[in-house]
Amino acid sequence: MELESLFSRSDRLVLFDTETTGLAYSKDEIIEFAAVVLERRDDKVQVMETYDELITLSPGGFVPAMIEKLTGISNQDIRERGVPKTRVCCDIARMFAGNTLLLAYNAHFDLSFLFYMLLRDGDVTILKGKDKLDLLTVYKDRRSYPHKLCNAIEAYGLSDKVVNSHRAVDDVLATVKVMKAMEAEKDDLARYIQLFGSHPTYGVDGKQIGSVTYKPQYYDPMQPLYEL
């Protein structure tokens, strides 16, 4: 069955992506959160929910010009369509509840931003005890540099199906396709659960996630990270 190794230990998979005002986890803010919820029903993997919301900013917060250029999300978009952080945090808690595996492409980045948003406006304990899988770490073991999501889309022949637009909803839909292509290529995704690759020279960007094991990951590894 599709994604058998992941569903053998989890009841639900939640793939997610964020767009943010910058790169500083504790200072910048999430402006868009998107997720795809997968569950196994009648021995088939089904999409149970596709979620996408723009998020209001704290007083004085704004979308920098370079972020608007990258994502197409403007300050006006946030004012007119953004929903409160507290509401998004409640939705995240609902999606993440139970025996759920959390997946993202560059998961350390997205989880770090989620941590601080949940800490301020929700229930950060929802992240505690959750298995986490970083598909960027998997891709770095599969292909040579560069390792952006757009590179994975091209490598797996998905350019006519999905797009890396730097909008969270597009990127998370692309991540779902990339994950399935990765599993079809080699069924070892479960071995990357709670294992994130880190920069071999600079280490982890920001604070480590307590439940995750970090190992230095080189651009052209001779063997999978889980065998080191």
Walk through the language-model features, giving the residues of each.
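Short phosphate-engaging motifs
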Residues: F109-D110, Y145, A174
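Short alpha-helix plus adjacent loop in nuclease-associated cores
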Residues: D131-H147
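Acidic, divalent-metal-coordinating active-site segment for phosphoryl/phosphodiester hydrolysis
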Residues: R167-A181
